[in-house]
């Protein structure tokens, strides 16, 4: 069930961002409505990530990603860090961090409205591209075609406390999209 919730929330977030990207050329939104859509899209993306994390924590082996990268006897810290300890989960983490920065940037009050809108539209384009990449090539919400009672376990190389602190590195790279956009 968490796989379905995660997948659908990711697809809806991509759809909202596609709508926002088109709004630059077709629709003329008010700032409040535009920012509301950005925030809703960000929350849907976070719901998608936390759905995957929930599947890891409860050892939902009906999710193929969880089956491939987790085991019911793993400590909780490795179940949580197993969420981003693989390609699919890491891409979803990156997209979630990008969404968090878009969410907070949409609350910014002391900048030019057209600059803020253009920055968020480019962030929406990044969200669309990464979201489509995740959905079509790196889907972490694939359903396991066979019933299994146990997962294969996390790669032994990744069973390190350093994996648990990996997200700050992703945050440091991802937040650089906001100051880079005005330079483009």
Predicted features and spans:
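Short aromatic-rich membrane-water interface segments that cap or initiate transmembrane helices
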Residues: 1-7, 71-90, 152-171
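Transmembrane alpha-helix boundary signature
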Residues: 50-65, 106-116, 132-145
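Structured, charged N-terminal subsegments at the starts of enzyme catalytic cores
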Residues: 75-77, 96, 101, 120-147, ...
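Membrane-interface helix-loop junction between the first two transmembrane segments
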Residues: 19-36, 61-65
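Conserved small/polar residues in nucleotide/adenosyl-binding loops
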Residues: 174-180
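Central hydrophobic cores of alpha-helical transmembrane segments in multi-pass inner-membrane proteins
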Residues: 12-25, 42-49, 74-78, 94-109, ...
